């Protein structure tokens, strides 16, 4: 099978990590990157040095000229174009474009990439109107006539596989989710203006910040059986990567906590292996930096109040796990074409 050729629009946290994932795989080929706000030299620096995931050590990396990055001998075309419809993805051979600016999350805005020759667009964020897919949960619902899709959010990618296992095995009556979420690039280093979210304008490295998240409700979009049964909120905390979901649910069928643990372990070692995970170790957040699984269930951290009411805890590297799923979704889409 020929390599799947991808382009990336927006070379921020997710864009750079999708590039790292793609460059280490044999089934995909990174052929182009677009970012109008940084030079090729700065792009090289930002890709090579990463405070969380460490220095890039897989290929020698250098700027060949102002329009080309070299990863070893492999050239990657670089554009610096603001308007998505003007980016010549087709000329660069990029069939699948990852829209990771965080700006063009609507279906119509993301579809502008198609005008430049892209065949499919994958939005690396939740979308209000593009169909959302979570690998390991509902990617098999994808149909080849869809040209713009969303990979949902990192938190939905953690929550949905866990919720699917619990709902399939025991049934979920209703539930509440809290994600304790590492800070992200949109937060403030010190207190600053944030008109739409006053708390979100407070210093990220100095506060625990209550925040909204649509991740739990979005599970209802990828798992219609749970539509209206889950909602949730977030606490943004002063860690730079790795987050954790606390899912508290009321079950239809009675189950002991040991039975729930066994069910999750079985699924994580079965056909979904590599997407959900399972641990019985005494872990903390930094133990999951660089983990490319979507959701790692922490068997020791959860508790049960009764056989119908339980709290389940699952970790995720909100950067690397999510970026890996973006590439996995592209691979699945290509297999359906």
UniProtKB/Swiss-Prot annotation:
<comment type="subunit">
    <text>Homotetramer.</text>
</comment>
<feature type="active site" description="Nucleophile">
    <location>
        <position position="154"/>
    </location>
</feature>
<dbReference type="InterPro" id="IPR020829">
    <property type="entry name" value="GlycerAld_3-P_DH_cat"/>
</dbReference>
<dbReference type="GO" id="GO:0050661">
    <property type="term" value="F:NADP binding"/>
</dbReference>
<dbReference type="InterPro" id="IPR020831">
    <property type="entry name" value="GlycerAld/Erythrose_P_DH"/>
</dbReference>
<feature type="binding site">
    <location>
        <position position="236"/>
    </location>
    <ligand>
        <name>D-glyceraldehyde 3-phosphate</name>
    </ligand>
</feature>
<feature type="binding site">
    <location>
        <position position="184"/>
    </location>
    <ligand>
        <name>D-glyceraldehyde 3-phosphate</name>
    </ligand>
</feature>
<dbReference type="GO" id="GO:0005829">
    <property type="term" value="C:cytosol"/>
</dbReference>
<dbReference type="Pfam" id="PF00044">
    <property type="entry name" value="Gp_dh_N"/>
</dbReference>
<dbReference type="InterPro" id="IPR006424">
    <property type="entry name" value="Glyceraldehyde-3-P_DH_1"/>
</dbReference>
<keyword id="KW-0963">Cytoplasm</keyword>
<feature type="site" description="Activates thiol group during catalysis">
    <location>
        <position position="181"/>
    </location>
</feature>
<protein>
    <recommendedName>
        <fullName>Glyceraldehyde-3-phosphate dehydrogenase, cytosolic</fullName>
        <ecNumber>1.2.1.12</ecNumber>
    </recommendedName>
</protein>
<dbReference type="GO" id="GO:0051287">
    <property type="term" value="F:NAD binding"/>
</dbReference>
<feature type="binding site">
    <location>
        <begin position="13"/>
        <end position="14"/>
    </location>
    <ligand>
        <name>NAD(+)</name>
    </ligand>
</feature>
<dbReference type="GO" id="GO:0006006">
    <property type="term" value="P:glucose metabolic process"/>
</dbReference>
<keyword id="KW-0324">Glycolysis</keyword>
<dbReference type="Pfam" id="PF02800">
    <property type="entry name" value="Gp_dh_C"/>
</dbReference>
<comment type="similarity">
    <text>Belongs to the glyceraldehyde-3-phosphate dehydrogenase family.</text>
</comment>
<dbReference type="InterPro" id="IPR020830">
    <property type="entry name" value="GlycerAld_3-P_DH_AS"/>
</dbReference>
<dbReference type="InterPro" id="IPR020828">
    <property type="entry name" value="GlycerAld_3-P_DH_NAD(P)-bd"/>
</dbReference>
<keyword id="KW-0520">NAD</keyword>
<dbReference type="InterPro" id="IPR036291">
    <property type="entry name" value="NAD(P)-bd_dom_sf"/>
</dbReference>
<feature type="binding site">
    <location>
        <position position="318"/>
    </location>
    <ligand>
        <name>NAD(+)</name>
    </ligand>
</feature>
<feature type="binding site">
    <location>
        <begin position="213"/>
        <end position="214"/>
    </location>
    <ligand>
        <name>D-glyceraldehyde 3-phosphate</name>
    </ligand>
</feature>
<dbReference type="GO" id="GO:0004365">
    <property type="term" value="F:glyceraldehyde-3-phosphate dehydrogenase (NAD+) (phosphorylating) activity"/>
</dbReference>
<comment type="pathway">
    <text>Carbohydrate degradation; glycolysis; pyruvate from D-glyceraldehyde 3-phosphate: step 1/5.</text>
</comment>
<keyword id="KW-0560">Oxidoreductase</keyword>
<dbReference type="GO" id="GO:0006096">
    <property type="term" value="P:glycolytic process"/>
</dbReference>
<feature type="binding site">
    <location>
        <position position="82"/>
    </location>
    <ligand>
        <name>NAD(+)</name>
    </ligand>
</feature>
<comment type="function">
    <text>Key enzyme in glycolysis that catalyzes the first step of the pathway by converting D-glyceraldehyde 3-phosphate (G3P) into 3-phospho-D-glyceroyl phosphate. Essential for the maintenance of cellular ATP levels and carbohydrate metabolism.</text>
</comment>
<feature type="binding site">
    <location>
        <begin position="153"/>
        <end position="155"/>
    </location>
    <ligand>
        <name>D-glyceraldehyde 3-phosphate</name>
    </ligand>
</feature>
<feature type="binding site">
    <location>
        <position position="35"/>
    </location>
    <ligand>
        <name>NAD(+)</name>
    </ligand>
</feature>
């Amino acid at each position: 099978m020929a390599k799947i050729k991808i382009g990336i629009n927006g070379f921020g946290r997710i864009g750079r990590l999708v590039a790292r994932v793609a460059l280490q795989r044999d089934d995909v080929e990174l052929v182009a990157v677009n970012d109008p706000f940084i030079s090729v030299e700065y792009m090289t620096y930002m890709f090579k040095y990463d405070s969380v995931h460490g220095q890039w050590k897989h290929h020698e990396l250098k700027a060949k000229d102002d329009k080309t990055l070299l990863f070893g001998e492999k050239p990657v075309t670089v554009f610096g174009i603001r308007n998505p419809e003007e980016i010549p993805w087709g000329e660069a051979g990029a069939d699948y474009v990852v829209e990771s600016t965080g700006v063009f999350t609507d279906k119509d805005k993301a579809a502008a990439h198609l005008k430049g020759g892209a065949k499919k667009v994958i939005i690396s964020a939740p979308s209000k109107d593009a169909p959302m897919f979570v690998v390991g949960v509902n990617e098999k619902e994808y149909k080849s006539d869809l040209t713009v899709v969303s990979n949902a959010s990192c938190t939905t990618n953690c929550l949905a596989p866990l919720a699917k296992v619990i709902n399939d095995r025991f049934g979920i009556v209703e539930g509440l989710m809290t994600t304790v979420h590492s800070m992200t690039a949109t937060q403030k280093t010190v207190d600053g203006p944030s008109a739409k979210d006053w708390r979100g304008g407070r210093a990220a490295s100095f506060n625990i910040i209550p925040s909204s998240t649509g991740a739990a409700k979005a599970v209802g979009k990828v798992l219609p059986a749970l539509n209206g049964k889950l909602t949730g909120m977030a606490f943004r905390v002063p860690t730079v990567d790795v987050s954790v979901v606390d899912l508290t649910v009321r079950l239809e069928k009675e189950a002991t906590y040991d039975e729930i643990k066994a069910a999750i372990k079985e699924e994580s070692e079965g056909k979904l292996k590599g997407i959900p995970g399972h641990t019985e170790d005494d872990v903390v957040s930094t133990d999951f930096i660089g983990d490319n699984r979507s959701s790692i269930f922490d068997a020791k951290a959860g508790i049960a109040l009764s056989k119908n009411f339980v709290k389940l805890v699952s970790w995720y590297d909100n950067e690397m796990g999510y970026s890996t799923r973006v590439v996995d979704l592209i691979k699945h889409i290509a297999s359906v074409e």
